Amino acid sequence: MIAAQAKLVYHLNKYYNEKCQSRKAAISKTIREVCKVVSDVLKEVEVQEPRFISSLNEMDNRFEGLEVISPTEFEVVLYLNQMGVFNFVDDGSLPGCAVLKLSDGRKRSMSLWVEFITASGYLSARKIRSRFQTLVAQAVDKCSYRDVVKMVADTSEVKLRIRDRYVVQITPAFKCTGIWPRSAAHWPLPHIPWPGPNRVAEVKAEGFNLLSKECYSLNGKQSSAESDAWVLQFAEAENRLLLGGCRKKCLSLLKTLRDRHLELPGQPLNNYHMKTLVSYECEKHPRESDWDENCLGDRLNGILLQLISCLQCRRCPHYFLPNLDLFQGKPHSALENAAKQTWRLAREILTNPKSLEKL
């Protein structure tokens, strides 16, 4: 048993050093290329409208606010200033979303975003995004990369297609630190020892973001209140949870396997599903020793089996907001197909670790 475990870990490490690292290097190169173009577009936007200041800064070889969705798809979160005169309200009526309401006694004119406040005093995510989209469209025509970048049509999101190869969504957002949403108040679960009080305090201090984007839990039937709502996002908090042991290595393996074998019709699976399932696996295996290097194979198999179960049940709950289903709106046939493909992959890795050389 131990020999089989060690063999699997050996082949996974080999796969990580060869395939995962080359994937990372290729994506880093793409990110540099993409961020040059996006920075140039955002510089033009800022000239036209100084309230939209580019926050796409490089720190320690990372671009702040950039998320990799897949090797050709990225999201850049553009942090806006001065949320201060608004109250953050998440009463659970819109899963995964919250609203920003003008604080009592505050005048509209005190807000930097005065013309985006609705009659009932809400700061409208849709109105801000609509204005931003117009500015980006103008900037694309003026910027020095105008030959290689164009707007993606037929969407209310702000998306750029670069060199006909990459798609980048630019999402206006507010950073919320020092508060924690009510809809995530159940976390951490009292009976689970992970991640421990110190890490919990760090995660909550990271806070969350409010994004101006279509909320997929609302799926097409948006009332005006819903289109004014902001989408909750916990990227920094989630990253902090995955520090230590082989957690990040495990996620890197899953992303690489997804990119190579689970990029399927209907796009049922993305990297965020993988990140979510690693967090759930941490709860199931709360001891640090469960994430030692020699447990890598067990953890990876556990996550792949959990993924198959989620696909078969057609439900993958968001880690911090379990009422939000990350498979919402995905075609059932695509989820079924993904379950079959994931099962084939898991069986192959488990029964014949050497097959990783070909995967």
From Swiss-Prot:
Keyword Metal-binding part of the UniProt annotation: yes
Known Gene3D superfamilies for this protein?
Answer: 1.10.1410.40, 3.30.460.90
Q: What is its main location?
A: nucleus
Positions of Mg(2+) binding? 73, 75
Any GO molecular function: metal ion binding
| EC class of the enzyme, as a word | transferase
Cite the Pfam families for this sequence.
Mab-21, Mab-21_C
Its GO biological process annotations read: cornea development in camera-type eye
Q: Where does a ribonucleoside 5'-triphosphate bind?
A: 23-24, 63-66, 248, 252-255
Q: Which family does it belong to?
A: Belongs to the mab-21 family.
Subunit structure and binding partners: Monomer. Homodecamer; composed of 2 back to back homopentamers. The protein may exist as monomer in solution and oiligomerizes upon ligand binding.
Q: Which PANTHER family match?
A: CELL FATE DETERMINING PROTEIN MAB21-RELATED (PTHR10656), NUCLEOTIDYLTRANSFERASE MAB21L1-RELATED (PTHR10656:SF38)
Q: What does this protein do?
A: Putative nucleotidyltransferase required for several aspects of embryonic development including normal development of the eye. It is unclear whether it displays nucleotidyltransferase activity in vivo. Binds single-stranded RNA (ssRNA).
Identify this protein by name: Putative nucleotidyltransferase MAB21L1
Biological classification of the source = Eukaryota, Metazoa, Chordata, Craniata, Vertebrata
